[in-house]
From Swiss-Prot:
This is Tyrosine--tRNA ligase. One of its GO terms (molecular function) is RNA binding. Residues 348-411 form the S4 RNA-binding domain. It is found in: Cytoplasm. L-tyrosine binds at Y41, Y174, Q178. It comes from the Bacteria. Keywords: Aminoacyl-tRNA synthetase, ATP-binding, Cytoplasm, Ligase, Nucleotide-binding, Protein biosynthesis, RNA-binding. Gene3D superfamilies: HUPs, RNA-binding S4 domain, Tyrosyl-Transfer RNA Synthetase. A motif ('HIGH' region) lies at residues 46-55. Homodimer. A motif ('KMSKS' region) lies at residues 234-238. Transmembrane segments: none annotated. Belongs to the class-I aminoacyl-tRNA synthetase family. TyrS type 1 subfamily.
Length: 412
């Protein structure tokens, strides 16, 4: 593909692909990026050991910036994770231990490396400067520049209070910490651009303003639209749970299936955001109708899976899907469900198995699925899921409806 250089209007390209919601100074940022390589940062708190597809838009945006010659900084909030961003949340996050935070940082870094070429200095932890700053020093350096009256006007704070939900002083101070992060990254690393979701707008503006009030560099902020599927679901979730970006939490086959099964109305938009296809091809694929649109969904699934898990995983997932839906053959590309010979000998049923693996929420849900013909072993409907499994089950394909398929694997 043709990769833009930093001399071109990168903002126009990002707008065309659907990445831009708001910008603190659109023309100023376009000129700044055209003037030469800039340093941009994207921040995440280390609340889990992976990221999910709700974070994917930001990773792809950072990828485009790096392709255009700009320098990525990926900030993981080792310090701010202890507090939790209250933006548009109804309750406080649980407090994590230092060991949990570090394990999460390690997991997130592995996901980053799939999308952005990391160098030794690409990954930053805000504990580097926040752990060493004293409370009185922080109030003097940062607190003096913020008005409580103005902070109370921000949507994230106001909505929490309007709903009469508790907001601790710890959480109230989060926006000041994020503003300080931006200024410190500007001072230490020459960072001039912060990226974030639309819910981060107030936090980003505060960083831009703090730098100005302290006589620092001119900083810029760019937010992305908060994505939802056309049927109203928040990006990051599926009916089965979070759609994670690492294979340990979600099998590449299930990741591929998420994209293959997306709503027809989302195909063009998702291709623009989550693939690197030229926009002419995106528009062509997005305009397909009927059965032809399924071809576009396969292109989307292959592209998104190749970025998250590699080309081999994408091909294996596509091959596995063809095996399931076309000729009914078994395929090792399916996610495995393990069961022990000892449990099988004790009279393990399919209902037991699905509940133990948290695939179904209740016995009644399994029975309803079976009654509707949606529970099958190697294509054969299971009429009584409560009956003990019998015969040779190793390698059998277990299907739950039309879109969820697993391969049984027997272990000693």
């Amino acid at each position: 593909m043709s990769v833009p250089t930093h001399q071109q209007d990168l903002i126009a390209l990002l707008e065309e692909r659907g990445f831009v919601h708001q910008c603190t100074d659109r023309d100023g940022l376009a000129a700044h990026l055209a003037a030469g390589p800039a340093t941009a940062y994207l921040g995440f708190d280390a609340t889990a050991d992976s990221l999910h597809i709700g974070h994917l838009q930001g990773l792809m945006l950072m990828r485009w910036l790096q392709k255009a010659g700009h320098r990525p900084l990926l900030l993981i909030g080792g310090a701010t994770t202890r507090i939790g961003d209250p933006s548009f949340r109804d309750s406080s996050r649980p407090i994590l231990t230092e060991a949990q935070i570090q394990a999460n940082i390690d997991g997130i870094a592995r996901v980053f490396s799939r999308y952005v070429e990391l160098h030794d200095d690409s990954l930053v932890n805000n504990a580097e400067w926040l752990d060493g700053v004293g409370y009185l020093e922080f109030l003097d350096r940062v607190g003096r520049h913020f008005s409580i009256n103005r902070l109370l006007t921000f949507d994230a704070i106001r909505q929490r209070l309007d709903r009469e939900h508790s907001l601790s002083f710890l959480e109230f101070g989060y926006t000041l910490l994020q503003a300080y992060d931006f200024v410190e990254l500007s001072r230490r690393r020459g960072c001039t651009l912060q990226l974030g979701g639309a819910d981060q707008w107030a936090n980003i503006i505060n960083g831009v303003e703090l730098s100005r009030r302290q006589g620092g560099a001119q900083l810029f902020g760019l937010t992305m639209p908060l994505l939802a599927t056309s049927d109203g679901r928040k990006m990051g979730k599926s009916a089965q749970g979070a759609v994670w970006l690492n294979a340990e939490r979600l099998a590449p086959f299930d990741f591929w299936q998420f994209w293959r099964n997306c709503d027809d109305r989302d195909v063009g938009r998702f291709l623009a955001l989550f693939s690197e296809l030229p926009m002419d091809e995106v528009r062509r694929l997005g305009a397909l109708q009927g059965a032809e649109l399924n071809e576009a969904k396969v292109v989307l699934a292959n592209a998104a899976t190749a970025l998250a898990h590699g080309e081999h995983a994408a091909r294996s997932a596509a091959d596995a899907a063809r095996g399931v839906f076309a000729d009914g053959t078994r395929d090792s590309g399916l996610p495995m469900m393990k069961l022990s010979r000892a449990r099988l000998a004790q009279g393990l049923s399919l209902t037991d198995l699905l509940l133990e693996h948290a695939i179904q929420p209740s016995r009644s849900a399994v029975r309803r699925l079976a009654a509707g013909g949606g529970l099958r072993l190697d294509g054969t409907p299971v009429s009584d899921p409560d009956a003990p499994l019998a015969g040779e089950v190793d390698g059998l394909r277990l299907s739950l409806g039309k879109k969820q398929h697993l391969q049984l694997r027997l272990e000693d």
